[in-house]
Each structure stands twice: as C-alpha cells, then as structure tokens.
Amino acid sequence: YYFENYVNEEALTLFIDPIISFLSLIGLNFFGEDPVSAGFGLFNAGGIIFMIVGISFSKGLADKYGKRDVFMSALFVSTLFIAVFYFFNPENLRLMFLSQILHGFFYGLTIPLLWAMIADVADYSEWKNNRRATAIIFSAMMVGLKGGLSIGGALVASILGYYGYEAGMDQGMNTLFGIKMLISIFPSIPFFVCVFILFFYQIDKKMESKIELDLKSSR
C-alpha cells in the first residue's frame, strides 16, 4: 500500500534505475520492469540482507552485555527507524531505504535473542520452582506469534477501511495519511510497549550467570 499509493513513482524510478541497471549487469534481473514492484522488492531485500547481518552480531553482543539489555536496546532503536517513516515525504527515497536497512540490522539483533530468552525463562522456572516448563513456555510463545499475525492482518484491513481506502482508485489525503500511519506510528506503538515491559524482565546478565551455575551444580 505504501509503495503503490504514497511513494512518488517518478522519484522512485529515478532512485532505483541505477541500482536495477547495476544488478542487471551482474545477472540479477528478477525485480521486473514495474518501478513500484521493483522498488518494493529492493526495499524488502535491503531490510532482509541487513537483518541477516544483524543476526550475526547478536551472540557476541549478548555474551558481552546480556540478552535482555541487547534485546531491549536493539528493539528500541529498530522501532525508532519505523517511527521516523511518519516524517518522510513521498520523495524521500534515500531516507526510506536507509531507515529500512537500519531497522533490518537492529531488528536482526533481536531475532535469535528472543528464542534464547524463552529458553532462559524455562531455566528460570526450573531454578525457581524445581520444575522445568519448557513445553508450556514455547507453546505460549507460538500461540502469541500466531495470534499476533492474525490480529495484525485484521487490524490492517480495518484501519485501511477506516481511512477510506479503495483498491485500484486514487487515494485521498486522509487515506494517504492512514497509509503513512500504518507503516510508522501504528506498528511502533506495540514495540515501544514491549520495550517498556522489558524493564520488568528480571533475567539480566548477572542473573543468567547465577541461574546457569546453580542449575549445573544441582543437576
């Protein structure tokens, strides 16, 4: 919706043409001729590539600073790079792509840490209650993920309808504002809430080490 309706197509074409030409020269010409589709493809590809780069840095940072602190900091910074889309006008292609790349990198730091922190919660359960609840904890996480995807998809459709979106039509200013909110402010809110909640998550680096040592000695 953002690329089809909000981004200036002429500015997008001028921005991606040199990139598409270079990629075609080296045999990577799978983005197509349509500038909107090609731009959206490059936009996503840039985020994914730098997300993978971020993942590769995750363990080293977590070992040094602790999973919770790295996860919380990276999630906060990555969310900032979502929120700033609110301030971009339709011609700010460089800033859009740069923000997407930086968001991908910092969000990539959080991906392996999320699952590692879930395992830490299972360890905490065993350490605190002498009973490991791995299956329940991971199942709850999967239910949350699937529920979030379902609710998120429904919310997108509802919000677009609220702002008067009509497929295949030229969108009014109110609808364009809604689309801009959908890529910036609305998705930022739950992430910022998660960052706030993480302040109450007790398993920091010091507690991680204590739990690990205590469990090793008791097993």
Q: Whereabouts are the PLM-identified features?
A:
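Membrane-embedded alpha-helical bundles of multi-pass transporters/translocases
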Residues: 1-219
